[in-house]
């Protein structure tokens, strides 16, 4: 059995790590970077992932997909998706099942299918490092992800060819990375995780007893639609509005210009973490009847902070709620860990420090901690990491809809998982022969205001007055936070159960089809790579042969030269096509046709040695002749 890798599947960047001895190691990708942009681009010939996809985004905005994690497990009609539709350069569309999917070149793609491309890149990165196949992974998700979003992440893993052994919450993973091997007896830490698209806050207690470490999540909260992308969007809106005031042109109508502004806004935001001001300079951003337009706007740190202060404030409000849920005061928090690239912003660090009355730790890498923690969890599951117990919680309350449209909670939020809970319900009408179990997730009393995870029917209930039948409903949450629900008629023993597959989720058939598509694409990608290699080889051989013809000169007879040049022309024509077999055949034909060239080159080399010797002798004679002449 191979290693279980740890993957931080991020909104903006992703990272992969693996246990190397007793320590987790972050693995560099093919480009030499420790993190990979979570960007996927579809071109005419191939699918690009990471930095190559990011580099061509400006020229291919409609088919370059980013921040897909914000769509995963979400309904098209949801407020968050409708907000994203207005600002994304690519087309978000409604799937047949009501999910938010993406339209690329006329094909509808599911977010798990797109995210699987990033996971495949992480898988390949690990395989290249380990020198062996990788089939198992621990993947992280925001702590505040609901069941549909967790299921969709597992689906993405399956499509990428990975058996997802565990889904682990990002703040919990960061705590594992921070606390593993610590000798402190008892400490309570706050993990503030503000990433590219999601925000989480978790209060975690780390205990050491007899050499065994226990990581217990006391409470968690957050917002799955708050992150660096939202900060970027505030800067983008500011730049576009300022340009419109100056030039009267709205850049939102130009996808290519919008992509340039997005890149510049992200760069400006990052620069303002260390500088007090920066200039956004985009020449030839657009043009009208009067000619080309240039964008040059100065952005100060103070302006950036004014644009995003409400976003930072909303994260601090979540801190207050989670501390209360954990039953802890600010003074009881020993350490604060900042995770996610957006926590590099000075305003974020300042507000967190003000809230806790102490500075956050600086010795945790905000980009890598989550992947390292996932790798540690992989080591725990594999048995390579001993004496570590992880106790996570469910982030949202779970229950069913009961009479009057009320949500009756069976499992409260922040309950340690895995867990199982049963409760007995009854019928609302006389002689009712069936009941519908509507499963909900959320904190609102009104059933319709919560997230619907799915519903099923329990039929065959014996006729009886209302309130008499006893229907036992059981919720079972596994260590991934994935839910199974069953309903049993205690009188007849009849039982109906479902593993919650939200109405918005992918069916097993769809996932299997996507797995097959991914495998087919992998084969197509391999063939394309082989074709490119054959073309490159053909180009190299043609160039080298031409050079040899020049060097051979008259040593190569005219007939042979004509045959070789014809073979070069045939090869160059084949290299422009897509038939690798033909390119290989024409390459071999050129090599064979070039045999006289090799013989001519050898003959010329041998002939070159003889004249060189003669020239040397002539030099000696001339010298002697001149010597005699002088003596006369």
Curated annotation (Swiss-Prot):
Q: Which GO terms describe its molecular function?
A: ATP binding; ATP-dependent protein folding chaperone; unfolded protein binding
Known SUPFAM superfamilies for this protein?
Actin-like ATPase domain, Heat shock protein 70kD (HSP70), C-terminal subdomain, Heat shock protein 70kD (HSP70), peptide-binding domain
Q: Quote the InterPro entries the UniProt record gives.
A: ATPase_NBD, Chaperone_DnaK, Heat_shock_70_CS, HSP70_C_sf, HSP70_peptide-bd_sf, Hsp_70_fam
Q: Spans of biased composition, class Low complexity?
A: 599-613
The PTM Phosphothreonine maps to 198
Concerning what turns on (or off) its expression, the entry says: By stress conditions e.g. heat shock.
Q: Where is this region: Disordered?
A: 599-632
Q: From which domain of life does this come?
A: Bacteria
Which keywords annotate this record? Answer: ATP-binding, Chaperone, Nucleotide-binding, Phosphoprotein, Stress response
What Gene3D superfamilies does the record point to?
A: 1.20.1270.10, 3.30.420.40, Actin, Chain A, domain 4, Substrate Binding Domain Of DNAk, Chain A, domain 1
Q: Pfam families, per this entry?
A: HSP70
Family listed: Belongs to the heat shock protein 70 family.
What is this protein for, i.e. what is its function? Answer: Acts as a chaperone.
In Swiss-Prot or TrEMBL terms, this protein is called Chaperone protein DnaK
What gene is behind this protein?
dnaK
